[in-house]
Amino acid sequence: MQSIALRRFRPPLEATVQLRNSTPIWIAFNGVHGTIAASRGPWRTSGDWWRPTMWDREEWDIEVRDVLYRIYFDVHMDRWYAEGVYD
C-alpha cells in the first residue's frame, strides 16, 4: 500500500477560486495558479458547534500542474483557503 502525507500550510493561505456547477475549476494562491485538472470532494467538516467560535467548511483535494493540494471553503467567513500540499 502506498501512502502520501499532507504538508499543512501554517496558517492556511487565502485563495481565489472559480467554480462551475459548485465545483472548483481554477485557483490562485501564493504564486500558484491554474486550471484544476482533477478534484474530489466536497467533504463537509465542522466543530465546536456549541461555541460562538464554531467552524464549518467544505474540503476538496485538487490537482494543479501535477501537484495535489487540499483546499477548503470556510462557510462562515465565505472564503477559500489552501490548507496544504500532498507529498
Where is each model-derived feature located?
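Non-catalytic peripheral regions of nucleotide-handling enzymes
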Residues: 1-87
